[in-house]
UniProtKB/Swiss-Prot annotation:
Subunit structure: Probably a heterodimer composed of biotin-containing alpha subunits and beta subunits.
Catalytic activities: 3-methylbut-2-enoyl-CoA + hydrogencarbonate + ATP = 3-methyl-(2E)-glutaconyl-CoA + ADP + phosphate + H(+)
Catalytic site positions: R330
Keywords assigned: ATP-binding, Biotin, Ligase, Manganese, Metal-binding, Mitochondrion, Nucleotide-binding, Transit peptide
UniProt record, GO biological process: L-leucine catabolic process
Name of the protein: Methylcrotonoyl-CoA carboxylase subunit alpha, mitochondrial
Residues that hold Mn(2+) 2 according to the record: E326, N328
Cofactor note as given: Binds 2 manganese ions per subunit.
Region (Disordered): 636-665
Length: 737
């Protein structure tokens, strides 16, 4: 049986006291109730932003915290945020954050009587929850039995079916023989979705359109599932071609009470991973909201659930029906959007329920106030298919947090995003009285979220938030695929429209750089402070001084231009700068610059004043210049001479061989681990034939031959780490001798 989605505008519920609730949620002052009971000291068995998030609430409740860390995270923000910290082991997760016995031992050594698992890692491990219980520790989460029942997606489907929760047609059995799975897929009918029975986050999911691709997809999904969750069993379901992903936040206590805190729409995804979530879901009726909430509560009650959980549904936009997909037995990454619309701290609820307290609200008392968005900011290379990226945060300036804007992060400027863990840098969460108001706030906050040093998806998120279909709430899980050309700004019209802003950005950057040099590089000459412009050629101590500058544009969303922007900057005696393009393609501009710090400037162009931020760093034999002006962010490069190249030493760069690779060379698409080498050096290959499999941040990537020929220089072996853009092998037309 399925429930139907009615696509009608939502009547916005308005409740008083929203500002007070949000202020309480974000406050760092101590709670009037305190944190007694079983949870008197908590170890957070996680890292990054979620560890910092849990510690913030614990601190507000007066509860001391213990962090755990790998060698890669020795100086991480979550370690510094805790009262105590314990080393777990080397960087690989299986030797650190997935080492259950080491984590329990850390809790016992430090006297922490409770463990909060966060999300990911061991958060959905029934064995870990059971181990905590056996050692007399409070696991801040659901009972092990519920984790086990719902963690096995095949078992959970059977339980949900018995409870009357609607299910997608599919195979959920224990038998994993590949021929049986193939037979079941044929019965279901293509396209089918292959999904691991354990874990989440899109890891190991494969959409298979044709029977001939099924076996390879199963093998790849099994490898990725094993690497991510330690279990490689799969289920096969009918693939809904035009789905929405809507999930319901539920909460239960140890006294049998279960409520829902409304739904979230998580349809905007790439690689089956969410990147923008919102609450409540747009364009649904109150009747649908009630029905899907009731189904989620029924699902939780069927397994005796307590603590925070999320019941995920797939909604068929063609038929209007929704189906149970899975239940996440933990706090979700996107829980802040729910916190914003109900005005409650869900981590505090988890702690109080672990203490044996009742739910603080009944279903009728849960408010629905306004609208909230969350945008996940990742280190990733968008033009390369959203592959994860690594590097140093040379400049990191999130938007300031307020009562209606939250930034959840686990990094600071100078930190390194490594290949070992998820590449998420931060979560930007905004709230408004309506969806439109919240969306305006999201767009503005994204345009002011400053990161430089490695590729990110901030520009892509801006394109998403500004797309007309998204503004109308017309979302499904194929949104990014459908509007790819719009979002990646690859059309001629889009590139033409951005050129003016890019040129203006270069002009402003040139003027600000000159101002910075003028102010900070003064020398003493005859007891007078004069700019280095006057002390060093080619500038003269005359009425005017001129400087030539070149900028090579690096577009975040691809379509990089090989053309150089050549600018001439003339310093005038009145302190202004006249900047013009060397080719005279556009009229010159008079720019007045006031310095407001190392990175911040106020510029005046023809009477129009605006704030500008610049970031500088050197990497890969280039000076990198980032500028933020208005809603725009641009990245320019300037090539350095060899003696001027203080490359970033914290992150190894590609070798000189990779920078000057011959025709047919295949470069590593990301920094990562070689999982499997499928061919031998010298082997004959066809265009598109898989040669090796790489893995980074738990995501698998198949490296294929770019053309037909013979493999040469294939030296990588399974287990070897390679750097981004390093040469993996070359495909040559003729067989090597």
């Amino acid at each position: 049986m399925a429930s139907r989605l009615l696509l009608l505008p939502r009547r916005r519920s308005r409740h008083g006291g929203a500002s007070l609730l949000l202020a309480r949620l974000l406050s760092s002052s101590s709670s009037e109730a305190g944190g007694g009971g079983a949870v008197e000291k908590v170890l957070v068995a996680n890292r990054g932003e979620i560890a910092c998030r849990v510690m913030r609430t614990a601190r507000r409740l007066g509860i001391p915290t213990v962090a755990v860390y790998s060698d890669a995270d020795r100086g991480a923000l979550h370690v510094r945020a805790a009262d105590e910290a314990v080393r777990l082991g080397p960087p690989p997760a299986r030797e650190s954050y997935l080492n259950a016995s080491a984590i329990v031992d850390a809790a016992l050594r430090t006297g922490a009587k409770a463990i909060h698992p966060g999300y990911g890692f061991l958060s959905e491990s029934a064995d870990f929850a059971q181990l905590c219980k056996a050692e007399g520790l409070t696991f801040i989460g659901p009972p092990p039995s519920a984790i086990r029942d719902m963690g096995d997606k095949s078992a959970s489907k059977r339980i949900m079916g018995a409870a009357g929760v609607p299910l997608v047609p599919g195979y959920h059995g224990a038998e994993q023989d590949i021929e049986l799975l193939k037979l079941e897929a044929n019965k279901i009918g293509y396209p089918v979705l292959i999904k691991p029975t354990h874990g989440g986050g899109g890891k190991g999911m494969r959409i298979v359109q044709r029977p001939e691709d099924f076996v390879d997809s199963v093998l790849s999904a099994q490898r990725e599932a094993a690497a991510s969750f330690g279990i490689n069993t799969l289920l096969v379901e009918k693939y809904i071609t035009q789905p929405r992903h809507i999930e319901v936040q539920i909460f239960g206590d140890q006294h049998g009470n279960v409520i829902h805190l409304y739904e979230r729409d998580c349809s905007l995804q790439r690689r089956h991973q969410k990147i923008i979530e919102e609450a409540p879901a747009p364009n649904v009726t109150a009747q649908f909201r009630s029905h899907i909430g009731e189904a989620a509560v029924s699902a939780a009650k069927a397994v005796g659930y307590y603590s925070a959980g999320t019941v995920e549904f797939i909604v068929d936009t063609l038929s209007g029906e929704f189906y149970f997909m899975e239940m996440n037995t933990r706090l979700q990454v996107e829980h802040p959007v729910t916190e914003m619309i109900v005005g409650q701290d869900l981590v505090e609820w988890q702690i109080r329920i672990a203490n044996g307290e009742c739910l603080p609200l009944s279903q009728e008392q849960v408010p629905l106030n306004g609208h909230a968005f969350e945008a996940r900011i990742y280190a990733e290379n968008v033009p390369r298919g959203f592959l994860p990226a690594t590097g140093t945060l040379h400049h990191y300036r999130p938007v300031p947090s307020t009562a209606t804007v939250r930034v959840e992060t686990g990094v600071e400027e100078g930190d390194t995003v490594s290949m070992h863990y998820d590449p998420m840098i931060a979560k930007l969460v905004v709230w408004g009285e309506s969806r439109n108001a919240a969306l305006v706030k999201l767009k503005n906050s994204l345009s002011n979220f400053q990161i430089a040093g490695l590729p990110t998806n901030v520009g892509f998120l801006q394109e998403l938030a500004g797309h007309s279909a998204f503004e109308k709430g017309l979302v499904d899980t194929h949104f990014i695929e459908r509007y790819q050309n719009d979002l990646l700004s690859t059309s001629t019209q889009a590139l033409s429209g951005s050129h003016e802003a890019e040129e203006l950005g270069a002009i402003l950057a040139a003027a600000c750089i000159c101002k910075k040099d003028h102010v900070s590089s003064e020398v003493s000459l005859h007891d007078k402070k004069l700019s280095m412009w006057y002390a060093h050629p080619p500038f003269r101590m005359h009425h005017f001084a001129k400087r030539l500058m070149e900028f090579e544009l690096d577009r975040e969303l691809g379509g990089s231009s090989d053309d150089l922007l050549k600018l001439s900057v003339t310093y005038r005696s009145d302190g202004t700068y006249f900047v013009e393009t060397e080719d005279g393609s556009s009229p010159g501009l008079d720019v007045k610059v006031d310095s407001r710090g190392d990175h911040d400037f106020r510029v005046d162009v023809g009477g129009l004043q605006t704030d500008v931020t610049l970031a500088f760093y050197s990497k890969d034999n280039c000076n990198h210049i980032h500028i933020w002006h208005g809603k725009h962010h641009h990245h320019y490069r300037q090539t350095l001479r060899a003696e001027q190249s203080p490359d970033d030493s914290s992150q190894p760069s590609a070798s000189s061989e990779a920078r000057s690779h011959p025709k047919g060379s295949v470069l590593a698409p990301m920094a990562g681990l070689v999982v499997k080498v499928l061919l031998k050096d010298g082997a004959r290959v066809e265009e598109g034939q898989p040669v090796m499999v790489m893995e980074a941040m738990k995501m698998e990537h198949v490296v294929k031959a770019p053309c037909a020929g013979y493999v040469e220089g294939l030296k990588a072996t399974a287990g070897q780490q390679v750097f981004d853009s390093s040469v993996l092998f070359t495909v040559k037309e003729n067989k090597p001798n």
